[in-house]
Design a protein with these regions (language model features):
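Glycine-rich FAD pyrophosphate-binding loop
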Residues: 1-11
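Conserved mid-domain beta->alpha element of the FAD-binding
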Residues: 107-108, 219-300, 304-306
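Acidic/histidine metal-binding catalytic segments
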Residues: 35-39, 202-218, 276-282, 291-295
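C-terminal helical "tail/cap" subdomain of flavin- and related membrane-associated enzymes
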Residues: 268-385
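A structural signal for short hydrophobic beta-strand segments in well-ordered beta-sheet cores
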Residues: 48, 97, 162-163, 233
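Catalytic P-loop NTPase motifs of RecA-like helicase/translocase cores
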Residues: 8-9, 115-116, 247-249
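Conserved FAD-binding catalytic core of PHBH/FMO-like flavoproteins
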Residues: 79, 102-225, 229
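Conserved N-terminal helical subregion
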Residues: 19-136, 344-364
């Protein structure tokens, strides 16, 4: 395995996931699943805070999820790969495929701007760039819930969503419209000046805590989301996984999770078929079909936040309900549950129910001792998973 970065380097802060990913990991590799569980943080409930001219309003969603630092996840997966005999070579950027030793299969997991994918037009790559600038930061404000915070400024609305990543540190993704970005001068300010301005704008939401621009990698920079699709995920003996194959908007919170599932499905297909091309054909057919609705939801979510000013003028409860509908239709009782969730006693009851659910799922997993892969030597088929990670509700 060639990794273009040095050991322990990562760009970004935290990743989020849900019980379905733990289920998949425990079925396929309980050792790494236990490590991921041990190094993750549980967050419960979601808050939507709106700071407008009328003061602060807060609305609530139920639900829970997990998060961990990106560096911790990479460490778990890299150490597990080494245990399984994988030759991991760090600091090795692949610029020319002809320089690689001959192989039956090349798996390209080099991100949305994949250089390997770019060497062939056969993938039919299409990249659409979103409108809103965003920046991926950290903060020493230790959020316990998943928090959306919207702030009215003289140049328009700016907002972040934040979640705990590791003890004492949270991930904080700031987004705004191009008009607000230019109006606040974020397009011309230096990196440090821009971060200090964001700290001042969000001083209430951050409770005076600081924003952190630099993780183990380079300082954070403003960017626009690249929505990547491909007509096919394989060509010859090269196959795409993760963001090289597909991207999902960060407001959906599923990119890392989907990349891991890609790898598992690819491994299953390779184990199922003797012929590599047959395996790649099945992987491509199943995963592209499963990701089609996910990417559609991603585009819808991205577009919703690009037009957030059409909704944010409502009271916080109505605004949060509109946010929860951005992925598409909901159950008929969704609105009633949303209204009930604004009551503290109902939120307490929902947390108690969620605690019971987590206990049940942990018991069912059983630490992976009787997983199918150990009994049969084959990976359990992961097809048919619910691929969309919906935080809201």
């Amino acid at each position: 395995m060639y990794d273009r970065d040095p050991p322990a380097a990562t760009y970004g802060w935290g990743v989020v996931y849900w019980d379905d990913l733990l289920d998949v990991l425990y079925r396929n590799d309980p050792e790494s699943a236990r490590e991921v569980t041990a190094r993750s943080v549980l967050w419960q409930d979601q808050e939507v805070r709106v700071h407008g001219s009328g003061g602060e309003q807060t609305a609530y969603f139920g639900g829970y999820g997990y998060s961990m630092s990106r560096s911790a996840l990479l460490d778990v997966l890299a150490r597990r790969a080494l245990q399984l005999g994988v030759d991991v070579q760090y600091g090795h950027r692949v610029a020319d495929l002809s320089t690689l030793p001959e192989a039956d299969l090349l798996v390209a997991a080099d991100g949305a701007n994949s250089g390997i994918r770019g060497q062939s037009a056969a993938f039919g790559t299409r990249i659409e760039v979103g409108l809103n600038p965003y920046i991926w930061l950290g903060t020493d404000q230790a959020f316990r819930s998943f928090v959306f915070s919207f702030e009215r400024t003289s140049a328009g609305w700016i907002w972040f969503h934040a979640y705990p990543s590791v003890a004492g540190i949270s991930t904080c993704i700031v987004e705004c419209s191009p008009q607000t970005w230019h109006g606040l001068g974020l397009d011309v300010l230096g990196r440090d000046q821009g971060v200090r301005l964001l700290e001042d704008l969000f001083k209430r939401a951050l409770d005076g805590h600081r924003l952190i621009s630099r993780s183990r990698g380079a300082p954070a920079h403003w960017q626009r989301f690249a929505h990547v699709t491909n007509k096919t995920w394989y060509h010859g003996t090269t196959v795409l996984v993760g963001d090289a194959a597909h991207t999902t908007h960060f407001t959906l919170g599923s990119g890392t999770r989907l990349a891991i599932i890609d790898a598992i499905v690819l491994a299953y297909s390779l184990q199922k078929y003797i012929d590599v091309e047959d395996a790649l054909r099945e992987y491509d057919r199943h995963r592209r079909a499963e990701l089609h609705p996910v990417q559609a939801a991603s585009r819808t979510s991205m577009a919703w936040f690009e037009h957030v000013d059409q909704y944010v003028g409502r009271d916080a409860v109505a605004f949060a309900h509109a946010m929860s509908l951005r992925h598409g239709g909901q159950n008929p009782w969704h609105h009633q549950l949303h209204l009930a969730t604004q009551i503290a006693a109902v939120r307490t009851a929902r947390r108690a129910f969620a605690t019971g659910r987590r206990w049940y799922l942990a018991r069912r997993r059983g630490g992976g001792k009787d997983d199918q892969s150990r009994r049969t030597g084959r990976l359990p088929c992961p097809f048919g998973l619910d691929q969309r990670g919906n935080r809201d509700g």
